[in-house]
Amino acid sequence: MSLLPYALARPFLFGLDPETAHELTMASLARTQGTLLSAAYCSSKVSDPIELAGLKFSNRVGLAAGLDKNARCIDGLAAMGFGFVEVGTVTPKAQPGNPKPRMFRLPEANALINRLGFNNDGLDAFLANVRKSAVRQKNAKNALLLGLNIGKNAATPIENAVDDYLICLDGVYPHADYVTVNISSPNTKNLRALQSDEALDALLGRIAERRETLAGRHGKRVPIFVKIAPDLDDAQVAVIATTLKRHAMDGVVATNTTLSRDAVKGLRHAEEAGGLSGAPVLEASNRVIGQLRAALGKGFPIIGVGGVMSGLDAVSKIKAGADVVQIYTGLIYKGPALVAEAANSIKNSR
């Protein structure tokens, strides 16, 4: 979608409830992908390849998980010029998420607050959608590097969370270019407790063991990334970095949404519960990225996400220590033109 059509569509979309606007956009994208109408969303892809974790990224800008929770729009999203796309978060069983309203715009801050709670159609429906996407077929002309993001059901006790992650890992493994283990959403009760020292060590130990089994079964070793929060102190980041390396994780996604409201105090909806995304997260996310890079060294892949609203923001993530970046809230505020803007800015910054 070019800048002008999105500029025309945005007032209409922003006149709707945020979740209604999201559902309408995704339904439209799902219906039109692969047709002439999908040209409205298309953007020429910037070529800026990089290899990370044995994967070849066609450029340095990807879509963050959360926009396409059910993998319904993979083909349409691929046409926007992303170097990679991450879909999910998927849980073993379908679940409705938290009560509505659960998504709020803070336009003065180019931000969103959501407390969706991993609403999704479940693993079986998710995998069916992945399998039928055109860009995932063998010998597809426009093959897409695809990440599949996994989580736990809200009804699963936190002490049994590993069971949900293993169920999802078993299911997504044959279909993923990489898998992201989401332990940082603030909208599933106690989920972030999995970032603590002992809990993370136990979880990643089990995931690493299962990955070895799956690698033997499927004849390929799929990289595993772990998505963490921005609301971590220096000591917590250091422990996470050590644990990632101990269990031979392949990369880290930094970061998820924040619980902090320091940057949006006094704004309408600022006190709504949930995770804050968009421009106010940029600084906190970059801080964590920098700490991770210092702790992990040069060769460990970092996907930077949080607050990318412009090409300059994308470059700031790379300078902080990320190898590639992801966008989500920026796409809502700026439209699909942000993909090429960010990718070109990164390419031209070197």
UniProtKB/Swiss-Prot annotation:
Transmembrane segments: none annotated. GO terms for biological process: 'de novo' pyrimidine nucleobase biosynthetic process; 'de novo' UMP biosynthetic process. It is a peripheral membrane protein. FMN binds at residues 65-69, 89, 149, 182, 227, 255, 278, 307, 328-329. SUPFAM superfamilies: FMN-linked oxidoreductases. It catalyses: (S)-dihydroorotate + a quinone = orotate + a quinol. Substrate binds at residues 69, 114-118, 182, 187, 256-257. The active site is at 185 (nucleophile). Keywords: Cell membrane, Flavoprotein, FMN, Membrane, Oxidoreductase, Pyrimidine biosynthesis. Pfam families: DHO_dh (PF01180). GO terms for molecular function: dihydroorotate dehydrogenase (quinone) activity. Binds 1 FMN per subunit. It is an enzyme of class 1 (oxidoreductase). Its cofactor is FMN. It is found in: Cell membrane. One of its GO terms (cellular component) is cytoplasm. Its EC number is 1.3.5.2. Pathway: Pyrimidine metabolism; UMP biosynthesis via de novo pathway; orotate from (S)-dihydroorotate (quinone route): step 1/1. Monomer. Catalyzes the conversion of dihydroorotate to orotate with quinone as electron acceptor. Belongs to the dihydroorotate dehydrogenase family. Type 2 subfamily. This is Dihydroorotate dehydrogenase (quinone). It comes from Polaromonas naphthalenivorans (strain CJ2). The lineage of its organism: Bacteria, Pseudomonadati, Pseudomonadota, Betaproteobacteria, Burkholderiales.
